């Protein structure tokens, strides 16, 4: 993730703001087009006639989507997954900048239609999110500790979403060194009673004090997909647990199972 992304996290309000009350199953979603970082720009623009162009340029600097970059033919081309209804090839790029890897990315995009009416995605910019597989453990109670029990917060806003086979999280935690090693893993704690239980494990490697900083991480839910398909489910409820600075927390996410065999 590029350094400026951390700054953007603090400046932006949400274009796709997720409001969920942790520890309950209540979860709603709404759309907002207001960016807090633009307030000062609008104030200055009222004094200058060149405001419109400057405002348009500044809007492009802020992320307005979390997408999946899906390589084709080894990355020679790729598709951009924006939502269940919006996906297609980029209109201004050919090769995937991430090669043959499928990754989640934070981006500023615009939906377009070609001459045949097919959807294409114009990419103003994008920045990859660290993307990894959720982990299935045989002895979760014993093995969880080795993955870390440090505390972090899951940000209730843009960037925290479950879609396209991924749990993407925007998190915040205390740290002194932005470049220090830290590990975040998602553990599938499957049982007959709770088949879709997930535990977020964080190891700060000792760097768990200082100022708070935010970041993004995405987990591919392949193991959850297998369990759900085995149970004949197309939609399931994920139960996520993590250790926060206020104590142990949990929340629920509705998840539409990804099926790549279609």
What are these regions (language model features)?
Residues 40-43:
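Conserved "right-hand" nucleotidyltransferase catalytic core of DNA-directed polymerases
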Residues 3-18, 24-26, 60-262:
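First exposed extracellular module after export/assembly in secreted or surface-exposed proteins
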Residues 52-55:
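Bacterial signal peptide processing site
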């Amino acid at each position: 993730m590029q350094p400026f992304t951390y700054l953007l996290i603090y400046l932006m309000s949400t274009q796709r703001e997720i409001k969920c009350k942790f520890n309950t199953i209540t979860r709603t979603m709404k759309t907002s087009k207001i960016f807090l970082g633009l307030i000062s720009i609008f104030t200055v623009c009222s004094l200058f006639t060149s405001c419109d162009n400057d405002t348009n340029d500044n809007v492009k600097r802020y992320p307005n989507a979390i997408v999946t970059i899906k390589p084709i033919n080894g990355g020679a081309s790729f598709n951009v997954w924006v939502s269940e209804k919006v996906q297609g090839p980029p209109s201004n790029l050919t090769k995937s900048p991430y090669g043959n890897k499928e990754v989640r990315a934070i981006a500023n995009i615009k939906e377009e239609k070609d001459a045949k009416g097919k959807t294409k995605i114009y990419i103003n910019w994008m920045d990859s999110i660290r993307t990894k597989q959720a982990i299935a453990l045989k002895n979760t109670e014993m093995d969880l500790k080795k993955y870390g029990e440090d505390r972090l917060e899951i940000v209730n806003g843009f960037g925290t979403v479950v879609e396209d086979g991924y749990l993407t999280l925007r998190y915040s935690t205390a740290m002194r060194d932005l470049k220090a090693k830290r590990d975040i893993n998602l553990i599938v704690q499957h049982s007959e009673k709770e088949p879709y239980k997930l535990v977020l494990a964080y190891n700060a490697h000792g760097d768990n004090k200082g100022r708070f900083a935010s970041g993004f991480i995405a987990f591919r839910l392949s193991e959850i997909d297998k369990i759900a398909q085995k149970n004949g489910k197309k939609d399931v409820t994920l139960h996520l647990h993590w250790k926060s600075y206020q104590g142990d927390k949990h929340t629920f996410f509705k998840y539409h199972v990804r099926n790549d065999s279609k």
